[in-house]
UniProtKB/Swiss-Prot annotation:
Keywords from the named record: Hydrolase, Lipid metabolism
Keyword Nucleus: no
GO-annotated molecular function: hydrolase activity
Keyword Lipid metabolism: yes
EC number(s) from the headed UniProt entry: 3.5.1.-, 3.5.1.74, 3.5.1.24
UniProt source species: Lactobacillus acidophilus
Protein name: Conjugated bile acid hydrolase
Record lineage: Bacteria, Bacillati, Bacillota, Bacilli, Lactobacillales
Pfam families, sorted: CBAH
Active site per the UniProt annotation: 2
Protein backbone atom coordinates (compact mmCIF):
# COMPACT_ATOMS: atom_id res chain seq x y z
CA UNK A 1 0.00 0.00 0.00
CA UNK A 2 1.13 3.57 -0.56
CA UNK A 3 0.14 7.24 -0.52
CA UNK A 4 1.09 9.81 -3.16
CA UNK A 5 0.95 13.58 -2.62
CA UNK A 6 1.57 16.75 -4.61
CA UNK A 7 1.13 20.48 -4.11
CA UNK A 8 2.71 23.77 -5.20
CA UNK A 9 4.18 26.61 -3.17
CA UNK A 10 3.47 30.35 -3.36
CA UNK A 11 5.84 30.60 -6.34
CA UNK A 12 4.26 27.71 -8.25
CA UNK A 13 7.07 25.23 -7.56
CA UNK A 14 6.02 21.58 -7.38
CA UNK A 15 6.51 19.31 -4.37
CA UNK A 16 5.62 15.74 -5.29
CA UNK A 17 6.34 12.35 -3.80
CA UNK A 18 5.03 9.40 -1.87
CA UNK A 19 5.07 6.93 0.98
CA UNK A 20 6.04 3.39 0.01
CA UNK A 21 4.07 1.03 2.26
CA UNK A 22 4.97 -2.64 1.82
CA UNK A 23 5.79 -5.77 3.79
CA UNK A 24 9.54 -5.52 3.16
CA UNK A 25 12.16 -3.33 1.63
CA UNK A 26 13.54 -4.26 -1.78
CA UNK A 27 17.03 -2.91 -1.38
CA UNK A 28 15.81 0.31 -2.96
CA UNK A 29 17.94 3.39 -3.21
CA UNK A 30 18.09 6.75 -4.92
CA UNK A 31 18.97 6.43 -8.61
CA UNK A 32 19.90 9.20 -11.04
CA UNK A 33 19.64 8.29 -14.70
CA UNK A 34 21.68 10.74 -16.79
CA UNK A 35 21.00 11.80 -20.32
CA UNK A 36 22.23 9.53 -23.12
CA UNK A 37 21.87 6.37 -21.03
CA UNK A 38 20.70 3.18 -22.83
CA UNK A 39 16.92 2.76 -22.63
CA UNK A 40 15.62 -0.60 -23.89
CA UNK A 41 11.96 -1.32 -24.58
CA UNK A 42 10.08 -4.61 -24.95
CA UNK A 43 7.98 -3.53 -27.94
CA UNK A 44 9.42 -0.18 -29.07
CA UNK A 45 12.82 0.51 -30.60
CA UNK A 46 15.62 0.74 -28.07
CA UNK A 47 16.90 4.26 -27.54
CA UNK A 48 18.84 6.42 -25.10
CA UNK A 49 17.57 8.81 -22.46
CA UNK A 50 17.02 12.44 -23.41
CA UNK A 51 16.34 13.85 -19.95
CA UNK A 52 18.00 13.22 -16.61
CA UNK A 53 15.77 11.52 -14.03
CA UNK A 54 16.01 11.13 -10.25
CA UNK A 55 13.98 8.91 -7.96
CA UNK A 56 13.80 5.82 -5.77
CA UNK A 57 13.98 2.30 -7.13
CA UNK A 58 16.14 -0.70 -7.88
CA UNK A 59 18.47 -1.47 -10.78
CA UNK A 60 17.55 -4.65 -12.68
CA UNK A 61 20.04 -5.81 -15.32
CA UNK A 62 21.22 -2.23 -15.75
CA UNK A 63 17.66 -0.89 -16.04
CA UNK A 64 16.59 1.73 -13.46
CA UNK A 65 13.24 0.39 -12.26
CA UNK A 66 11.73 3.34 -10.41
CA UNK A 67 9.03 3.40 -7.75
CA UNK A 68 8.78 7.18 -8.21
CA UNK A 69 10.84 9.45 -10.45
CA UNK A 70 11.09 13.02 -11.73
CA UNK A 71 12.75 14.49 -14.78
CA UNK A 72 14.89 17.60 -15.06
CA UNK A 73 11.90 19.57 -16.40
CA UNK A 74 9.84 18.96 -13.26
CA UNK A 75 7.50 16.24 -14.53
CA UNK A 76 7.13 13.30 -12.14
CA UNK A 77 5.36 9.95 -11.83
CA UNK A 78 4.79 7.50 -9.00
CA UNK A 79 3.41 3.96 -9.22
CA UNK A 80 1.16 2.79 -6.37
CA UNK A 81 -0.34 -0.60 -5.67
CA UNK A 82 -3.75 -1.20 -7.30
CA UNK A 83 -4.63 -4.81 -6.36
CA UNK A 84 -7.80 -6.55 -7.58
CA UNK A 85 -8.36 -3.83 -10.17
CA UNK A 86 -5.28 -3.45 -12.38
CA UNK A 87 -5.55 -5.46 -15.60
CA UNK A 88 -3.07 -4.93 -18.41
CA UNK A 89 -3.26 -6.12 -22.00
CA UNK A 90 -2.21 -9.70 -22.77
CA UNK A 91 -0.06 -8.53 -25.68
CA UNK A 92 0.79 -5.69 -28.06
CA UNK A 93 -1.89 -4.15 -30.28
CA UNK A 94 -1.17 -3.01 -33.83
CA UNK A 95 -1.20 0.74 -34.24
CA UNK A 96 -0.71 1.43 -30.53
CA UNK A 97 2.27 2.60 -28.50
CA UNK A 98 2.86 -0.69 -26.70
CA UNK A 99 4.62 -0.47 -23.36
CA UNK A 100 5.32 -3.10 -20.76
CA UNK A 101 3.59 -1.72 -17.68
CA UNK A 102 6.87 -1.09 -15.84
CA UNK A 103 8.15 0.99 -18.78
CA UNK A 104 5.61 3.78 -18.33
CA UNK A 105 7.76 5.48 -15.67
CA UNK A 106 10.69 6.23 -17.96
CA UNK A 107 8.54 6.60 -21.08
CA UNK A 108 6.68 9.47 -19.41
CA UNK A 109 9.73 11.18 -17.96
CA UNK A 110 11.75 10.83 -21.16
CA UNK A 111 9.20 12.04 -23.67
CA UNK A 112 7.26 14.81 -21.98
CA UNK A 113 7.57 18.05 -20.06
CA UNK A 114 3.93 18.74 -19.21
CA UNK A 115 1.02 16.63 -17.99
CA UNK A 116 -1.13 17.98 -20.83
CA UNK A 117 1.23 16.30 -23.31
CA UNK A 118 1.05 13.01 -21.41
CA UNK A 119 -2.76 13.07 -21.37
CA UNK A 120 -2.88 13.40 -25.14
CA UNK A 121 -0.25 10.70 -25.77
CA UNK A 122 -1.94 8.20 -23.44
CA UNK A 123 -4.91 8.04 -25.82
CA UNK A 124 -2.78 5.79 -28.04
CA UNK A 125 -0.96 3.76 -25.36
CA UNK A 126 -1.46 0.06 -24.65
CA UNK A 127 0.04 -1.20 -21.39
CA UNK A 128 1.09 -4.84 -21.69
CA UNK A 129 1.23 -7.43 -18.92
CA UNK A 130 4.97 -8.00 -19.28
CA UNK A 131 7.48 -8.25 -16.42
CA UNK A 132 10.97 -6.80 -16.52
CA UNK A 133 12.41 -10.34 -16.42
CA UNK A 134 11.46 -13.83 -15.27
CA UNK A 135 12.54 -13.11 -11.68
CA UNK A 136 9.80 -10.51 -11.22
CA UNK A 137 6.02 -10.61 -11.41
CA UNK A 138 4.01 -7.83 -13.02
CA UNK A 139 3.08 -5.32 -10.33
CA UNK A 140 -0.63 -4.33 -10.29
CA UNK A 141 -0.15 -0.56 -10.27
CA UNK A 142 -1.86 2.69 -11.05
CA UNK A 143 0.01 5.98 -11.40
CA UNK A 144 -0.09 9.61 -10.38
CA UNK A 145 1.63 11.95 -12.84
CA UNK A 146 2.23 15.61 -12.03
CA UNK A 147 3.88 18.83 -13.08
CA UNK A 148 3.53 22.24 -11.43
CA UNK A 149 0.20 22.92 -13.18
CA UNK A 150 -1.84 19.76 -12.71
CA UNK A 151 -1.90 16.08 -11.84
CA UNK A 152 -3.57 13.06 -13.38
CA UNK A 153 -4.26 9.49 -12.35
CA UNK A 154 -3.78 6.65 -14.85
CA UNK A 155 -5.59 3.37 -14.24
CA UNK A 156 -6.04 0.29 -16.40
CA UNK A 157 -8.74 -2.13 -15.28
CA UNK A 158 -10.66 -5.06 -16.74
CA UNK A 159 -13.94 -3.21 -16.41
CA UNK A 160 -12.99 0.16 -17.91
CA UNK A 161 -9.72 -0.29 -19.80
CA UNK A 162 -7.41 2.72 -19.54
CA UNK A 163 -8.91 5.71 -17.75
CA UNK A 164 -7.23 9.05 -17.04
CA UNK A 165 -8.59 11.23 -14.24
CA UNK A 166 -7.76 14.80 -13.26
CA UNK A 167 -6.51 14.81 -9.66
CA UNK A 168 -7.48 18.15 -8.15
CA UNK A 169 -6.97 17.04 -4.54
CA UNK A 170 -3.36 16.02 -5.24
CA UNK A 171 -3.57 12.60 -3.57
CA UNK A 172 -3.55 8.93 -4.56
CA UNK A 173 -3.65 5.79 -2.44
CA UNK A 174 -4.70 2.29 -3.50
CA UNK A 175 -7.81 0.30 -4.40
CA UNK A 176 -10.67 0.86 -5.12
CA UNK A 177 -10.47 2.99 -8.27
CA UNK A 178 -9.81 6.72 -8.15
CA UNK A 179 -13.36 7.72 -9.05
CA UNK A 180 -14.62 5.71 -6.05
CA UNK A 181 -12.29 7.67 -3.77
CA UNK A 182 -13.57 10.99 -5.13
CA UNK A 183 -17.16 9.87 -4.54
CA UNK A 184 -16.27 8.76 -1.00
CA UNK A 185 -15.02 12.26 -0.18
CA UNK A 186 -18.67 13.28 -0.21
CA UNK A 187 -19.08 11.46 3.10
CA UNK A 188 -16.72 13.93 4.75
CA UNK A 189 -18.01 17.32 3.61
CA UNK A 190 -18.84 18.15 7.22
CA UNK A 191 -15.17 18.25 8.17
CA UNK A 192 -13.91 21.72 8.99
CA UNK A 193 -10.60 22.97 10.40
CA UNK A 194 -12.50 25.43 12.65
CA UNK A 195 -13.65 24.32 16.06
CA UNK A 196 -17.31 23.78 16.82
CA UNK A 197 -19.06 26.31 19.04
CA UNK A 198 -21.20 25.80 22.12
CA UNK A 199 -24.86 24.97 21.52
CA UNK A 200 -28.05 24.67 23.50
CA UNK A 201 -29.77 21.31 23.42
CA UNK A 202 -33.25 21.94 24.81
CA UNK A 203 -31.79 24.33 27.35
CA UNK A 204 -28.75 22.24 28.15
CA UNK A 205 -25.51 23.96 27.18
CA UNK A 206 -23.29 21.61 25.21
CA UNK A 207 -19.74 22.82 24.61
CA UNK A 208 -16.59 21.21 23.18
CA UNK A 209 -13.90 20.17 25.63
CA UNK A 210 -10.95 21.22 23.50
CA UNK A 211 -9.60 22.00 20.05
CA UNK A 212 -10.02 19.84 16.96
CA UNK A 213 -13.79 19.41 17.10
CA UNK A 214 -14.26 20.62 13.52
CA UNK A 215 -12.25 17.64 12.28
CA UNK A 216 -14.10 15.10 14.42
CA UNK A 217 -14.61 12.05 12.22
CA UNK A 218 -11.43 12.47 10.19
CA UNK A 219 -10.19 8.90 9.56
CA UNK A 220 -6.96 7.75 11.13
CA UNK A 221 -6.54 4.09 10.19
CA UNK A 222 -4.42 2.60 7.41
CA UNK A 223 -6.96 1.39 4.84
CA UNK A 224 -6.55 3.08 1.43
CA UNK A 225 -9.93 4.84 1.57
CA UNK A 226 -9.16 6.48 4.90
CA UNK A 227 -5.60 7.42 4.03
CA UNK A 228 -6.99 9.08 0.90
CA UNK A 229 -9.52 11.12 2.89
CA UNK A 230 -7.03 12.20 5.54
CA UNK A 231 -4.26 13.11 3.08
CA UNK A 232 -6.70 15.02 0.85
CA UNK A 233 -8.18 16.91 3.81
CA UNK A 234 -4.76 17.89 5.14
CA UNK A 235 -3.47 18.81 1.68
CA UNK A 236 -6.44 21.09 1.02
CA UNK A 237 -6.34 22.80 4.42
CA UNK A 238 -2.61 23.09 5.07
CA UNK A 239 -1.67 26.76 4.53
CA UNK A 240 0.43 27.61 1.48
CA UNK A 241 4.02 27.82 2.67
CA UNK A 242 6.89 30.03 1.55
CA UNK A 243 10.37 28.73 0.87
CA UNK A 244 11.86 25.31 0.30
CA UNK A 245 12.42 24.41 3.95
CA UNK A 246 8.84 25.16 4.97
CA UNK A 247 7.36 23.29 2.02
CA UNK A 248 9.48 20.19 2.54
CA UNK A 249 8.37 20.23 6.18
CA UNK A 250 4.76 20.59 5.02
CA UNK A 251 5.14 17.62 2.70
CA UNK A 252 6.62 15.31 5.31
CA UNK A 253 4.14 16.47 7.96
CA UNK A 254 1.23 15.44 5.74
CA UNK A 255 2.63 12.11 4.60
CA UNK A 256 3.90 11.10 8.03
CA UNK A 257 0.34 11.58 9.31
CA UNK A 258 -0.80 8.71 7.05
CA UNK A 259 2.32 6.56 7.44
CA UNK A 260 1.86 2.91 8.36
CA UNK A 261 3.69 2.19 11.60
CA UNK A 262 5.47 -1.14 11.91
CA UNK A 263 3.40 -3.48 14.06
CA UNK A 264 0.08 -1.75 13.36
CA UNK A 265 -0.75 -3.69 10.18
CA UNK A 266 0.00 -7.38 9.58
CA UNK A 267 -0.84 -8.73 6.12
CA UNK A 268 -2.30 -12.13 5.22
CA UNK A 269 1.22 -13.53 4.92
CA UNK A 270 1.96 -12.63 8.54
CA UNK A 271 4.31 -9.78 7.60
CA UNK A 272 4.26 -6.24 8.93
CA UNK A 273 3.13 -3.70 6.35
CA UNK A 274 4.83 -0.40 7.07
CA UNK A 275 6.08 2.79 5.46
CA UNK A 276 9.53 1.87 4.19
CA UNK A 277 10.36 5.38 2.98
CA UNK A 278 8.88 8.82 2.42
CA UNK A 279 10.19 10.91 -0.47
CA UNK A 280 9.57 14.37 -1.90
CA UNK A 281 10.93 16.02 -5.04
CA UNK A 282 11.22 19.81 -5.25
CA UNK A 283 11.06 20.97 -8.86
CA UNK A 284 12.37 24.42 -7.99
CA UNK A 285 15.71 23.21 -6.65
CA UNK A 286 15.74 19.82 -8.44
CA UNK A 287 16.27 18.17 -5.07
CA UNK A 288 15.04 14.75 -3.93
CA UNK A 289 14.38 14.46 -0.19
CA UNK A 290 13.81 11.13 1.54
CA UNK A 291 13.97 9.28 4.83
CA UNK A 292 13.37 5.70 5.88
CA UNK A 293 11.50 3.75 8.54
CA UNK A 294 14.75 2.85 10.28
CA UNK A 295 16.56 6.14 9.58
CA UNK A 296 14.60 9.37 10.05
CA UNK A 297 17.48 11.63 9.05
CA UNK A 298 16.36 13.62 6.01
CA UNK A 299 18.65 12.91 3.07
CA UNK A 300 18.99 15.15 0.02
CA UNK A 301 20.12 14.41 -3.53
CA UNK A 302 20.27 16.87 -6.41
CA UNK A 303 20.06 16.83 -10.15
CA UNK A 304 23.09 18.95 -11.00
CA UNK A 305 25.50 19.26 -13.91
CA UNK A 306 27.66 16.44 -12.59
CA UNK A 307 24.92 13.85 -12.03
CA UNK A 308 22.86 14.84 -15.08
CA UNK A 309 25.85 14.37 -17.37
CA UNK A 310 27.28 11.22 -15.82
CA UNK A 311 28.24 8.40 -18.18
CA UNK A 312 26.53 5.80 -15.98
CA UNK A 313 23.75 5.46 -13.44
CA UNK A 314 24.40 7.30 -10.19
CA UNK A 315 23.19 5.21 -7.26
CA UNK A 316 23.08 5.89 -3.53
Amino acid sequence: MCTGLRFTDDQGNLYFGRNLDVGQDYGEGVIITPGNYPLPYKFLDNTTTKKAVIGMGIVVDGYPSYFDCYNEDGLGIAGLNFPHFAKFSDGPIDGKINLASYEIMLWVTQNFTHVSEVKEALKNVNLVNEAINTSFAVAPLHWIISDSDEAIIVEVSKQYGMKVFDDKVGVLTNSPDFNWHLTNLGNYTGLNPHDATAQSWNGQKVAPWGVGTGSLGLPGDSIPADRFVKAAYLNVNYPTAKGEKANVAKFFNILKSVAMIKGSVVNDQGKDEYTVYTACYSSGSKTYYCNFEDDFELKTYKLDDHTMNSTSLVTY
